[in-house]
Regions:
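Beta-strand acidic-aromatic groove motif in beta-rich domains, primarily in extracellular
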Residues: 408-419, 516-517, 570-572, 595-607, ...
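Extracellular glycan-recognition surfaces and repeat-rich motifs
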Residues: 348-380, 510-558
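Active-site-proximal substrate-binding groove within the catalytic cores of carbohydrate-active enzymes
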Residues: 37-42, 46-47, 57-78, 85-338, ...
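Secreted extracellular polysaccharide-interacting domains
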Residues: 379-393, 422, 433-436, 539-543, ...
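Extra-cytoplasmic beta-strand recognition segments
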Residues: 348, 384-413, 453-459, 468, ...
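Aromatic- and glycine-enriched glycan-recognition loops and surfaces
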Residues: 1-26
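Extracellular beta-strand ligand-recognition surfaces/modules
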Residues: 445-485, 506, 589, 602, ...
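Extracellular carbohydrate recognition and processing domains
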Residues: 422-463, 609-643
Length: 670
């Protein structure tokens, strides 16, 4: 995390941590009955939460000690996002004290609800995301407060002041299911850049009227030292105009806005209609003879060439709804994808990445945007093979994870360390991606089967070279790869002996996801209700406060499903566990559940199209009476198709299911 922060700061990014000081969860290291009231439950998704005794927590100094611990672990963090706080109500002294603690450690404060932490918070989620949350909690509408603090905060009702605008939040990487980068780009440059330009200045004069629909029109003047800004709009049928020192920098929806970051001057241009427009340069850009126009894309800047200046004016030919920046070439730094990882551009996001970062041996592979707007490496039909040499981390045990999708077409991933090869193949992706916050999540219109594939390998002391190869056989369907990631491995769970396919105790804290499982179709595309639960006795265990299950069965970690909706809850996939055709396997695991006739183990051959495709194997009965762990064991035979998977089905009752020590063994040959 610290590396991410330090590298991100070079790109002018800021980083925060999401906290909750209203509720606490039993897994939290600071959780105890002194912190929370066990009789008052809060949000209940991955686990039940309990309301914190906020005043005692503040007065005791324990909360501040937790903040100081965070500061020690992430010294360059920029801000704290306070979730829930105030529960859509005011909280007086408690809010001021919370912010005092946050600010004293060099962080600024942001939060969820506009009507809490008003004095100190500079950004509210429910204000910034117009379509999220309640319609009556959308920010401050006070003209007096905005007059005083417009340059300090993004906490306003952003749709009632066309003069000043408002910073609007738009997701494109999976939050609330959104993946449209074009919408994000549109709101950034059409709405947010003009808003932020005005926030570089303080309001000095406010002469407006309020229309019948609540919209504010007229003239607002702003200043920052000698720099003077005026924004005007007469009514809803008139264009907005912004001038800087009497030079028009925005007219209607088009603009050429001056910007200065770290001493470097540039000009942002946006014209929703496109075409040719002429603009006067502000004083800082006048006299510069080496200005270039750059198109801004999600793969970096595209140099459109030098732009001529005549009488301190520039004429720009722009595409509609396309952002540009005018700057001197020596102020443009190249973008590097994959900093701090063994890979160059592990997500295929760089322009010309195949040419620059990979060796292409054969095939029709290319990087393209998929239906969700994500750049992926895609092979259409031909036999395809690409390879990248990697920067080896220190000697040790590692796992390569990458997103993979293929259909009736063999895909092979090979890690080569020195002279040793580690290979994994998959012929068919049978499980759609139901993780809402994953940009690769599925939809009815655009089914997505991208799921993690894992290859375990070791780096010996004398290793000097390493590579990763992605290969696809010839076929009639599209195969995709994306998001390569190498993590250090703490356990050996795959093929520890000749008969054992996997022995997963979930104790590897470096591991990614729920391996070898993925979220099934239960609940549809949503934030999952399944996670790896960490032991924190007695609070996570059977008996405390009426707990009917232990969240951790053995060791420090177990897999927990909490109140999951009806359907296929968990399943393996062929790229993680391959049940070979006609071979006999024994599947076993330990479990607890408070549900009787709620959870069922079984198999699926291919994709689950309807519930009848799930074939129950064995029983999972309640352990709630005594809290004693039970053991499941069953034999299954791999289908001739090679597409057999194992999973857990639920009827959807508000019950929990805990799994540990998941093991698959294959019958030995006699």
């Amino acid at each position: 995390m610290n590396q991410l922060i330090d590298e991100g700061h070079k790109l002018n990014a800021v980083f925060g941590v999401h906290i909750n000081d209203t509720e606490s969860y039993p897994e939290a290291k600071g959780f105890n009955e002194e912190l929370v009231d066990p009789t008052k439950r809060g949000w209940d998704w991955l686990d039940p939460s309990y309301f914190i005794k906020q005043r005692p927590d503040a007065l005791s100094g324990r909360r501040y000690e937790r903040f100081k611990e965070l500061k020690q672990k992430a010294p360059n963090l920029d801000y704290i996002y306070v979730d829930v706080w105030g529960n859509q109500g005011e909280s007086g002294w408690a809010s001021r004290q919370l912010s005092k603690e946050i600010n004293s450690l060099g962080w600024f404060t942001t939060n969820e609800f506009p009507n809490a932490l008003e004095y100190d918070s500079v950004w509210n989620h429910w204000s910034a995301e117009k379509d999220y949350g309640g319609t009556t909690t959308k920010g401050f509408n006070s003209t007096i407060v905005r007059f005083i603090r417009n340059h300090q905060k993004d906490t306003w009702i952003i749709s009632d002041n066309p003069l000043l605008g408002g910073a609007e939040f738009e997701a494109y990487e999976g939050w609330v299911g959104k993946t449209n980068f074009n919408t994000y780009r549109q709101k950034t440059f059409a709405i947010n850049v003009p808003t932020k330009f005005l926030q570089h200045y303080q309001i000095t004069n406010w002469e407006t009227t309020t229309a019948a629909d609540g919209q504010i029109y007229g003239t607002i003047k702003l200043a920052n030292g000698a720099e003077k800004v005026t924004v005007t709009q007469a009514d809803a049928n008139s264009p907005r105009s912004i001038t800087l020192n009497e030079t028009e920098v925005l007219k209607g929806d088009a603009y050429l806005l001056p910007w200065n970051v770290n001493g470097q001057d540039k000009l942002y241009h946006w014209n929703p209609k496109g075409g040719t427009s002429t603009w006067s340069l502000d004083k800082k850009m006048q006299g510069k003879t080496n200005l270039h126009l750059y198109e801004l894309t999600d793969q970096g800047r595209i140099d459109k060439g030098a732009i001529a200046t005549t009488n301190n004016q520039v004429t720009i030919q722009a595409e509609a709804n396309t952002p540009y920046v005018i700057a001197e070439p020596d102020s443009i730094e190249p973008m590097t994808f994959g900093t701090g990882t063994p890979f160059k551009d592990p997500g295929f996001n760089e322009a010309n990445t195949l040419k620059n970062n990979w060796k292409v041996f054969r095939g029709d592979g290319e990087v393209k945007k998929d239906a969700n707007g994500d750049y992926v490496f895609s092979s259409e039909k031909e036999r395809t093979e690409i390879k990248q040499d990697i920067n080896l981390p220190k000697p040790g045990k590692y796992s390569l994870y990458l997103n993979t999708e293929t259909h009736d077409r063999k895909a092979t991933v090979t890690v080569k360390i020195g002279g040793k090869k580690y290979t994994r193949t998959v012929n068919n992706s049978v499980a759609q991606n139901y993780i809402q916050a994953d940009i690769n999540h599925t939809s009815r219109k655009n089914p997505q089967y991208m799921q993690n594939m894992r290859i375990d390998f070791e780096i010996p002391d004398n290793a000097k070279k390493g590579s990763v190869t992605l290969a696809v056989d010839k076929g009639n369907s599209v195969t995709k790869f994306d998001d390569l990631r190498i993590v250090e491995r703490q356990t050996d769970i795959m093929n520890p002996d000749k008969q054992t396919v996997i022995k997963q105790d979930f104790e590897d804290t470096q591991a990614v996801g729920l391996y070898p499982f993925v979220k099934g179709s239960a609940g549809g595309v949503e934030d999952p209700r399944i996670h790896l639960s960490e032991r924190n006795e007695p609070y996570t265990q059977y008996g405390w406060n009426g707990n009917l299950v232990s969240d951790v069965l053995e060791g420090n970690w177990s897999l927990k499903a909490h109140k999951q909706g009806a359907g296929l809850m968990l399943q393996t996939i062929p790229q993680n566990i391959k049940f070979e055709p006609n071979k006999k396997y024994t599947v076993q695991f330990d479990y607890q559940t408070d549900g009787e006739n709620v959870f069922t183990a079984g198999t699926i051959n291919g994709e689950l199209k309807n519930n009848n495709d799930f074939k129950p194997v064995g029983e999972l009965t309640s352990t709630a009476a005594d809290g004693q762990t039970k053991h499941y064991e069953a034999e299954i035979i791999g289908d001739a198709s090679g597409n057999t998977t194992f999973g857990i089905f639920t009827t959807g009752a508000d019950k929990d299911f805990i799994m540990d020590n998941f093991t698959v063994t294959v019958e030995s040959k006699k």
